[in-house]
UniProtKB/Swiss-Prot annotation:
Similarity remark: Belongs to the UPF0149 family.
A single Gene Ontology CC term: cytosol
Name of the protein: UPF0149 protein Avin_47340
Matches recorded under InterPro entries: YgfB-like, YgfB-like_sf
Gene3D superfamilies: YgfB uncharacterised protein family UPF0149, PF03695
SUPFAM superfamilies the record matches: YgfB-like
Domain of life of the source: Bacteria
Alphabetized PANTHER family for the sequence: UPF0149 PROTEIN YGFB
HAMAP family referenced in this protein's UniProt entry, alphabetically: UPF0149
Length: 184
């Protein structure tokens, strides 16, 4: 019996309890990809994309979790962060499970980015990042459960924490901060 209390495990359990057979990593990747491509942070548009990925109507508890996930992503992308937090299994999970989730995250990111970006021209640097993500999405079975495999996983994960910011800067540009209520 797993005692993993990570956000990934909690989100995974929530999805499973609602009959959804999707990885939290893939959902997070899709959200981050669409956001980085300039889709914006409008909740209903994100929920519609998530419903398509999840195969239909979203139960309220999953809906609330998806809204929370979007708020987290919006804060990371617009708050001057130097890296994003990836929704992946904890370090205690077997390397094969973490590598598979990393691949799912990349697949979700590419799907979300592609839907939102359309045929927009991209810089050579942005194209290279997308090509890297496509290559990483295929890596899950290539990592061996060893110190070397662990090191390669960590290196790829660190790259993925900063790569989305390049794409966001190029495609989405600056987002106006939410208006603060005036105090009278």
């Amino acid at each position: 019996m797993s005692t993993d209390k990570s956000p990934y495990a909690a989100f995974s359990a929530l999805l499973a309890s609602s009959g959804r057979d999707r990885s939290p990593a893939e959902l997070h990747g899709q959200l981050l990809g669409r956001s980085c491509a300039g889709a914006g942070f409008e909740v209903d548009a994100w929920l519609a994309d998530a419903a398509d990925l999840l195969g239909g109507q979203i139960p309220d508890n999953v809906r609330q979790a998806l809204i929370g996930l979007q708020e987290m992503v919006k804060g990371e992308l617009t708050g001057g962060e130097v890296a994003v937090v990836l929704l992946l299994p904890s370090d205690e999970a077997p390397l094969a499970e973490r590598a598979a989730a990393l691949g799912q995250w990349c697949q979700g990111f590419l799907g979300g980015f592609g839907l939102a970006a359309g045929d927009r021209p991209l810089s050579a640097e942005a194209m290279e990042v997308l090509q890297d993500l496509a290559a990483i999405s295929q890596v899950q079975s290539a990592l061996e459960d060893s110190e070397e495999g662990e090191g390669a996983y960590m290196e790829v994960m660190e790259y993925l924490r900063v790569a989305p910011l390049l794409l966001f800067t190029e495609c989405a540009g600056p987002v106006a901060p939410a208006p603060k209520p005036s105090v009278h």
